[in-house]
């Protein structure tokens, strides 16, 4: 049920980067691509695809990244701007509730919630579902170099094995 979904606010390497630090990630069917051991997986058995979701207040951005698998977003609420290219300058589209976008593999993309604030939604909260192809979607995020640099400046380091280390939280980078 929708009201039983449990978000993870530390799912990705940009969880401490200002402007991206208010994201919520949901893994509904399958483990998805979260980099955090704190991510709650609602149904771990996946039937050949993963369904997740992203939610965030207006002004919050999901940093530029790409995937090894196909990705489809279905807008549930809010107004979202999707942008692509290594620096996010190769194109963009704005989507509303009910709109669907399919993004190809190996293309850097990001998205921002651009919902207008109003009395019924004072923080401009938006929500969208994400569908990832394949049973092995875990660890399938490739971050743009500038995203990795910004994350390190805010204490998050992504190891080669996909483990996220939070140096501001007292975690240390293993030797080797």
Where do the PLM segments sit?
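A structural connector/turn signal
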Residues: 51, 61, 70, 90, ...
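A short, N-terminal "cap"/entry segment at the start of jelly-roll beta-barrel domains
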Residues: 1-48, 158-176
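Glycine- and acidic-residue-biased ligand/ion/polar-headgroup-sensing regions
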Residues: 58, 68-81, 85-86
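Short histidine-centered beta-strand/loop micro-motifs
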Residues: 39-44, 62-67, 84, 92-94, ...
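Conserved short histidine dyad/triad with adjacent acidic residue
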Residues: 32-39, 50-67
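Short acidic-glycine-tyrosine-enriched beta hairpin
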Residues: 74, 86-106
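Histidine-centered metal-chelating micro-motifs
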Residues: 60-63, 81, 98-101, 105-110, ...
């Amino acid at each position: 049920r929708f009201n039983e979904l449990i978000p993870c606010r530390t799912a990705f390497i940009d969880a401490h980067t200002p402007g991206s630090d208010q994201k919520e990630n949901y893994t509904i069917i399958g483990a998805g691509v979260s980099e955090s051991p704190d991510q709650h997986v609602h149904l771990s058995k996946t039937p050949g695809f993963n369904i997740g979701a992203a939610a965030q207040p207006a002004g919050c951005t999901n940093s530029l990244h790409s995937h090894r698998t196909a990705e489809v977003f279905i807008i549930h609420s809010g107004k979202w701007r999707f942008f692509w290219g290594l620096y996010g300058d190769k194109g963009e589209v704005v989507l509303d509730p009910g709109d669907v976008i399919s993004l190809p593999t190996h293309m850097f993309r990001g998205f921002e919630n651009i919902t207008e604030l109003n009395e019924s939604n004072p923080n401009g909260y938006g929500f969208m579902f994400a569908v990832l192809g394949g049973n092995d979607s875990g660890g399938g995020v490739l971050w743009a170099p500038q995203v990795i640099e910004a994350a390190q400046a805010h204490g998050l380091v992504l190891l080669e094995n996909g483990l996220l280390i939070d140096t501001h939280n007292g975690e240390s980078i293993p030797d080797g």
